[in-house]
Amino acid sequence: MGILTLNVEEKIKIISKNTAEIVTIDELRKKLEENQKLKGYIGFEPSGLFHIGWLIWAQKLKDLVDVGVDMSILVATWHAWINDKLGGNLDKIKLAGQYAIEVLNAYGVDMSKVRIVYAEDLVKDSNYWALVIRIAKNTSLARMKRALTIMGRKAEEAELDTSKLIYPAMQVADILYQDLDIALGGTDQRKAHMLARDVSDKLGKKKVIAIHTPLLIGLQGGQRMEGVEEDDYLASVKMSKSKPETAIFVHDPPEVVEAKLRSAYCPKGVVIDNPVLQINKYIIFAKDNATLKVERDIKYGGDIEFKSYEELEKIYSEGKLHPLDLKLATARKLNEILDPIRKKLESKTEFTLLVEELEKGVTR
């Protein structure tokens, strides 16, 4: 179905699929009804290896492009430098950015319809830094510290060096400077997006619509504790490249993907915080007309094919599907998705070398 044949509700259905929240859906509907050409962005720190959790926002980026949003990708090199990623080596950070763009291209994002913006393009403009200062002037120190969770850091880590405090103001400036309608990110970016919405009123800037995608839980699963905020809990158990044992990377060979899924947390009949089911919901069934074929011996019920995630979850929650059967089927399907990405990366020596180097010592 082409962009011109989609009505407003069809666009909203595509945009909202597999999102944690849209702030606000009414603002999005209003802009779509006015037939405005919307501008959006996703920013990421090029900080290492690309794991499958990032495919969730990559799919949403693809969805937004497919419904006609003018999307840009901000390769946040300076932000990664401030955040001490890759030892603060800007050359490595830039190469990691190029590697991530290659992954997105191989995944199926139409890069001819996406603008690539590097942090260097923004920071060379004095107007950008003037905006950073204006944002800082309109934000309390306490709120700026609370926003450090967007970096994967705690508020007290602001004491490490003063640049950490500048980071949230820079991320808000990234949004306001580009005059965006939509900011896309994981739920861990919520505090920056909410700050951007609040500050925009004070500065007379356009109020951005925030689209947040879920964070994929790590393969270890999660242990929920009373009194812990949902955002803090999810940030602590999410799949992370700094905890490689919890993650599946897009370059992992098929046998490694299968081995990791075999050992993943996946209790029989348990749906909550089940990483194997989440991979199905947010990655496998995020694609149009997706199916999952589970191969079983006839004495265990024979093969079964699921045509929706809802059907899979129902059968699994009823205890009618063995965890190992689910894991092996998920590994086969996930490897089908990862295969073109692996081939693309293997065809370029510089990315093969980068992956090897990063695997030797994973940094923050």
Swiss-Prot record:
GO biological process: tyrosyl-tRNA aminoacylation
Residues the record lists as binding ATP: K241
Top-tier EC class: ligase
Keyword Cytoplasm found: yes
Keywords from the UniProt entry: Aminoacyl-tRNA synthetase, ATP-binding, Cytoplasm, Ligase, Nucleotide-binding, Protein biosynthesis
Catalytic reaction list: tRNA(Tyr) + L-tyrosine + ATP = L-tyrosyl-tRNA(Tyr) + AMP + diphosphate + H(+)
Keyword Chaperone: no
GO molecular function, one term: ATP binding
Binding partners and assembly: Homodimer.
Function: Catalyzes the attachment of tyrosine to tRNA(Tyr) in a two-step reaction: tyrosine is first activated by ATP to form Tyr-AMP and then transferred to the acceptor end of tRNA(Tyr).
Name of the protein: Tyrosine--tRNA ligase
Taxonomic source organism: Sulfurisphaera tokodaii (strain DSM 16993 / JCM 10545 / NBRC 100140 / 7) (Sulfolobus tokodaii)
